[in-house]
């Protein structure tokens, strides 16, 4: 298999014969170039595709990869494996310095005893809920962009409101402007003690305020149960102030 398909002219014939016309018309087979089909995952475990070719698009504006895998026994999850190889090829393309993802066309060469090939070649059909998978993987992914959500709307977000308010305003020149809002959100008892402690430490370490002690006191008015923690932080701020002075 590899002796044949690693030969450029043979690979050109194979793709010209077996690629659907709609895909073939976007490929410039004259620019076909054999690539390494070995990939290494984050856990350093290597995996290999059979054949990987790169080529320019017919318009010359981008790159297309043809990933050819051969199989003698049907595999229910073959399309998922092909997707893993395809995404690995995309990542390698970016690692080379390209700014846009290439289209990777997986092609399965099957020569098993069972005929015809018994499984769908649509990888979405591998999911227990193909309809949901199609909605997730063929549309835009959900986006929680807090930069465009109003503070009033964020204030209604129950246990996530403190986190969203912090992250939205952490780069403000003075966090004092949202101290009251944060204090009220913390007082609603949606959050765990660990979450509130982490929030206070984060605000004072990563945020900016011209009056850090007043900021602490404002929060303390709403969450007096954290007085000990607040006083510890306030004492630290006083010491830092003396050192800076």
Would you name each region that the model predicts?
Residues 1-244:
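Elongated, amphipathic alpha-helical interaction scaffolds
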